A protein has these predicted regions:
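Glycine-rich phosphate-binding loops of nucleotide-dependent enzymes
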Residues: 1-341
Length: 341
């Protein structure tokens, strides 16, 4: 883009990403709810001012993560090996655990085994070796339904392919994953009154717009689709949340909202496994951060101390000169990561 502007070209650049807008544009015009709400010169405006224009209220861009000692282990991944659809090892002998009141982050360049790892952890792909232990039970070969019934919530990487049925309305989409559980289902079939009430609660609590549970999922913006998926999953009162790229393709206001909800669960003592390719996201939210490269956790680092340059080198499979390590976990005597270094 810089080369094109140097050649005298005029560029119209459309994005909902705050950083991109501030970096790439000279002037930014903000559209909100279909209306022009203002224009700013990026040399004079701050990120906070632009975010407020975009959302219509003050947005907290820096996440405040309260101190909280972790509790017992909720999820253990032991020597896990998973092959991809082509028969190649996407995950190789991976080890880590996630504890109560902890966000364990996974950082890496997309395509380094994250998708296959999440599928194995959530019961959607059978591993080729190793174990997944959830709340003390080996669930390696258990169904997705059993994972849900045991208290695992899942925010999928692709909300439109895995999280929603786009032709269903929000009442029907709110039932997904709950179709076998009380109070939404019993021996007589689906209780549509309870199901509708559940969808209305999610729409209200998570500020899904438009606030119409009869709206079909495809009619919602990406951010509102994601907020509905997050609300449905969190409403299960899970002991573990597996969040795969939870803010991909959503606006800055929705990002703030989802981050706040994840940290609220952490503060309540829930365990969170977070996978994201956004370095600022995993660094802000995680208590410990596992870095993956070619299907292996190459290191587990302190997200508050590691630099973006060090993370980038680890993600590329290179060895930084010095990386801040996590201390041994209380009560285990084990290193914090369980990675391969």
């Amino acid at each position: 883009l810089d080369e094109l502007t140097d050649q005298g070209k005029t560029i119209i650049f459309i994005t909902h990403k705050l950083g991109e807008a501030m970096h790439a544009a000279d002037d930014v015009t903000v559209l909100r709810d279909g209306e022009n709400v203002g224009s700013v010169d990026t040399d004079d405006a701050t990120r906070e001012e632009l975010a407020e224009l975009m959302v219509g209220r003050e947005v907290i861009l820096e996440t405040d993560k309260a101190e909280r000692p972790p509790g017992d282990v909720v999820l253990s991944v032991d020597d896990l090996t998973v092959t991809d659809d082509g028969g190649y090892d996407a995950v190789a002998d991976m080890n880590f655990d996630v504890r109560e009141g902890e966000v364990f982050g996974i950082a890496g360049v997309d395509g380094n085994g994250q998708s296959e790892l999440i599928e194995a952890v959530t019961g959607m792909r059978t591993p080729d070796g190793g174990r997944v232990v959830f709340d003390g039970t080996d669930v390696t070969d258990r169904s997705r339904r059993e994972h849900i019934e045991r208290g695992m919530a899942y925010i999928p990487e692709d909300r439109q392919e895995e999280g929603l049925v786009m032709e269903f309305d929000l009442v029907e989409n709110g039932l997904l994953g709950n179709q076998h559980t009380d109070p939404y289902a019993d021996t007589g079939g689906i209780d549509w009154g309870a199901t509708r009430g559940h969808a209305e609660d999610v729409v209200s609590e998570y500020d899904v717009r438009p606030p119409d549970v009869e709206a079909e999922a495809h009619s919602l913006s990406g951010g509102n689709q994601q907020k509905f998926v997050v609300g449905r999953e969190f409403s299960r009162d899970p002991s573990l949340v597996v969040a795969s790229h939870p803010t991909r393709g959503v606006d800055i206001g929705s990002i703030e909202f989802i981050h706040d909800r994840l940290l609220e669960l952490r503060q309540e003592g829930k365990a969170v496994l977070l996978v994201s390719s956004k370095l600022d996201e995993v660094r802000q939210l995680s208590d410990r951060l596992g870095v993956v490269h070619e299907g292996e956790i190459v290191d587990v680092v302190d997200p508050d101390a590691v630099t973006e340059e060090q993370l980038g080198m680890l993600m590329a499979g290179e060895e930084p000169t010095s990386v801040p390590q996590m201390a041994a976990r209380a009560g285990t005597g084990a290193p914090a990561g369980g990675g391969s270094r």
